[in-house]
C-alpha cells in the first residue's frame, strides 16, 4: 500500500501549522491521535469540539471515505481523508502511526457514532499507546448508551454485546453464554435479521422485558417496548422491516435473585450480630430485598440459631 501523502494547509492546534498539513511536533515529538464521534442519525449529533478537531488535524482516517466526505461537505470541513477499515486496519495503522511519530495530528472516525465501538480502530489505538503517542477520545454520540437511557431498562449495570453471529446455531450459543448475566444486555441488529434474532433471544434467555430502538436520533426515531415474544410478534406483521436496531434486554432475573439472596444473608447476619430483634430483622430484609416472606423468615431463624436466641421474635 502506498504511503499517505499530505497536501493541504491546516491550522495548528497544540503546535505550529505547516503547509503539508502537519504541525510542529510538541515536546514529545509526536502528533496526537483523536478519536472523534460522528452523528448516529441526526447531523446535529456532532459536537462543536469534534468539528474544530476535524478541521485542524492533518489526516482523518475514515471507515468509508465516501460517507465521511458527504458529512464533511455539510459541515464545511476540508480534510485529508484516508480509508481505515477491517480489510486494511493492520497496514494502515502502521502508516498512521508513522505520521503521528512525525508530528501529524490524526483523527479517527467511524461511519456513525463513536470509533472502536463495534468498529475498527483498536489496533491503531493500541499501537499509539505502545509508542507513547497521545490519544485523546472525544465524547459524543453512541447508539448503545443512547438506546439504554431511553429504554426504561435498568441502567446501573450493562453489558454491551454488539452484533451476534449471523447463523442461528452460533447465535444461540453466544446467547447461552449470556443467559446468567445480571446486567442489562445491549445488541445491534440489521433489519433483515431482527425478527430471527428476537426469536432466538426469547428462546434462549426467556421472555424478558426488552426495548427496541429504531433509527436513533433521526426524525422517525422509535422505541418499541415490551417482552421479547411480544416484540417479535409486532415486527413479524411488518411486510418489510426497515431501520437499524439497537436492542436492550433486561438481565437475568435468576442472577438478580441470587444477588438479592446474598444481600439478604449478609444483612441478616449483620443485624443479628448487632443484637437486633428478629421481627425488626425480618421487616428490614424484606423491605430492602423484596424477597418472599417465608424465605426471609427461614434465613432469620437460621441466623438466630447460629448466634443464640433473640427476644421479641
Swiss-Prot record:
SUPFAM superfamilies documented for this protein: Tetrapyrrole methylase
Main location per the UniProt record: cytoplasm
EC main group: transferase
Any one GO molecular function term: methyltransferase activity
Keyword Cytoplasm on entry: yes
Matches recorded under CDD domains: RsmI
Keyword Ion transport in annotation: no
Gene3D superfamilies: Cobalt-precorrin-4 Transmethylase, Domain 1, Methyltransferase, Cobalt-precorrin-4 Transmethylase, Domain 2
Annotated spans, Disordered: 1-23
Location relative to the cell: Cytoplasm
Assigned keywords, A-Z: Cytoplasm, Methyltransferase, rRNA processing, S-adenosyl-L-methionine, Transferase
EC number assigned by the record: 2.1.1.198
GO biological process: methylation; rRNA processing
Catalyzed reactions per annotation: cytidine(1402) in 16S rRNA + S-adenosyl-L-methionine = 2'-O-methylcytidine(1402) in 16S rRNA + S-adenosyl-L-homocysteine + H(+)
GO cellular component: cytoplasm
InterPro entries per record: 4pyrrol_Mease (IPR000878), 4pyrrol_Methylase_sf (IPR035996), 4pyrrole_Mease_sub1 (IPR014777), 4pyrrole_Mease_sub2 (IPR014776), rRNA_ssu_MeTfrase_I (IPR008189), SAM_MeTrfase_RsmI_CS (IPR018063)
Protein origin, superkingdom: Bacteria
Function, as annotated: Catalyzes the 2'-O-methylation of the ribose of cytidine 1402 (C1402) in 16S rRNA.
NCBIfam families recorded: 16S rRNA (cytidine(1402)-2'-O)-methyltransferase (TIGR00096)
Similarity remark: Belongs to the methyltransferase superfamily. RsmI family.
The protein, known as: Ribosomal RNA small subunit methyltransferase I
Gene source species: Micromonospora olivasterospora
Gene: rsmI
Amino acid at each position: 500500500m502506498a504511503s499517505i501523502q499530505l497536501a493541504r494547509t491546516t491550522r495548528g492546534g497544540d503546535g505550529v501549522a505547516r503547509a503539508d498539513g502537519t504541525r510542529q511536533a510538541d515536546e514529545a515529538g509526536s502528533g496526537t491521535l483523536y478519536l472523534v464521534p460522528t452523528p448516529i442519525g441526526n447531523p446535529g449529533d456532532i459536537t462543536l469540539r469534534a468539528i474544530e478537531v476535524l478541521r485542524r488535524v492533518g489526516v482523518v482516517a475514515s471507515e468509508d471515505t465516501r460517507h465521511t466526505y458527504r458529512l464533511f461537505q455539510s459541515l464545511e470541513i476540508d480534510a485529508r481523508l484516508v480509508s481505515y477499515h477491517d480489510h486494511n486496519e493492520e497496514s494502515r495503522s502502521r502508516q498512521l502511526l508513522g505520521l503521528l511519530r512525525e508530528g501529524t495530528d490524526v483523527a479517527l472516525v467511524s461511519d456513525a457514532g463513536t470509533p472502536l465501538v463495534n468498529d475498527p480502530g483498536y489496533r491503531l489505538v493500541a499501537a499509539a499507546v505502545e509508542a507513547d503517542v497521545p490519544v485523546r477520545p472525544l465524547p459524543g454520540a453512541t447508539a448503545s448508551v443512547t438506546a439504554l437511557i431511553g429504554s426504561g431498562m435498568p441502567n446501573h449495570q450493562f453489558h454491551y454485546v454488539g452484533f451476534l453471529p449471523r447463523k442461528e446455531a452460533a447465535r444461540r450459543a453466544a446467547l447461552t453464554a449470556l443467559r446468567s448475566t445480571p446486567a442489562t444486555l445491549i445488541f445491534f441488529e440489521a433489519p433483515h435479521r431482527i425478527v430471527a434474532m428476537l426469536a432466538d433471544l426469547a428462546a434462549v434467555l426467556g421472555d424478558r422485558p426488552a426495548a427496541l430502538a429504531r433509527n436513533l436520533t433521526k426524525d422517525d426515531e422509535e422505541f418499541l417496548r415490551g417482552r421479547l415474544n411480544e416484540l417479535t410478534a409486532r415486527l413479524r406483521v411488518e411486510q418489510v422491516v426497515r431501520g437499524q436496531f439497537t436492542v436492550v434486554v433486561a438481565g437475568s432475573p435468576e442472577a438478580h435473585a441470587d444477588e438479592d439472596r446474598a444481600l439478604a444473608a449478609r444483612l441478616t447476619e449483620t443485624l443479628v450480630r448487632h443484637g437486633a430483634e428478629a421481627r425488626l430483622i425480618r421487616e428490614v430484609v424484606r423491605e430492602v430485598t423484596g424477597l418472599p416472606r417465608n424465605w426471609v423468615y427461614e434465613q432469620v431463624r437460621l441466623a438466630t440459631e447460629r448466634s443464640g436466641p433473640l427476644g421479641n421474635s
